[in-house]
Amino acid sequence: MPPVLILLTLLLPLGAGAEEIIGGHVVKPHSRPYMAFVKSVDIEGNRRYCGGFLVQDDFVLTAAHCRNRTMTVTLGAHNIKAKEETQQIIPVAKAIPHPDYNATAFFSDIMLLKLESKAKRTKAVRPLKLPRPNARVKPGDVCSVAGWGSRSINDTKASARLREAQLVIQEDEECKKRFRHYTETTEICAGDLKKIKTPFKGDSGGPLVCDNKAYGLLAYAKNRTISSGVFTKIVHFLPWISRNMKLL
């Protein structure tokens, strides 16, 4: 299978191009009610898409590198290209990236989106729980990541329907070998070296879900690598998340 050609030398922010979940499967419609589709437009009118998840009725968590001038969130979607009755499209009132976010090394790649209005909870729209402060995932644990994206590395068209892939949590030492800027305090890496089944060049900000809780946010992948991805470790940022949601 030919390698994916990427412009950046070492690391690629996952939201920089077409959204892709490599491998995986289409999920049952509206079975992931926490998923958010984040659409943004920059000052030149260029559109960008990211993933995210509903953490509270009026807050969505996503990656900081998804920030843009104008942003809207679609909740309750399965087929993002269709006008589904379950969908709720809500403008973003304020984007709050973490103050320590570093765009070069992707440190603290996490952002809260305060919605202009509260989402209405339905069977298709529900928040996802966060882990407890002392909760941890360990190497070998199987988690999942979902998003709207391509079905293979040769497919340039985004999938209209929500897809999900199962990923295995990797050893921190192995992650450090693969990712130059990897920091175990604030990051988790997950994937499967034996299978092409991982997020790659898109779906930034989508949750790494383990035991029905969000343990990570999809951040970046290594150049020419489709076997693993790095996720911002949500547990580390719980105080910041809680503090900012209370302030707004």
Swiss-Prot record:
Residues 19-20 form a propeptide. GO terms for molecular function: serine-type endopeptidase activity. Its EC number is 3.4.21.-. Pfam families: Trypsin. Residues 1-18 form the signal peptide. InterPro entries: Peptidase_S1_PA (IPR009003), Peptidase_S1_PA_chymotrypsin (IPR043504), Peptidase_S1A (IPR001314), Trypsin_dom (IPR001254), TRYPSIN_HIS (IPR018114), TRYPSIN_SER (IPR033116). CDD domains: Tryp_SPc. Glycans are attached at N68, N102, N154, N223. SMART domains: Tryp_SPc (SM00020). The active site is at H65 (charge relay system), D109 (charge relay system), S204 (charge relay system). It is found in: Cytolytic granule. Its main location: other. GO terms for cellular component: cytolytic granule. Disulfide bonds join C50-C66, C143-C210, C175-C189. It comes from the Eukaryota. This enzyme is probably necessary for target cell lysis in cell-mediated immune responses. Belongs to the peptidase S1 family. Granzyme subfamily. This is Granzyme E. It comes from Mus musculus (Mouse). The gene is Gzme.
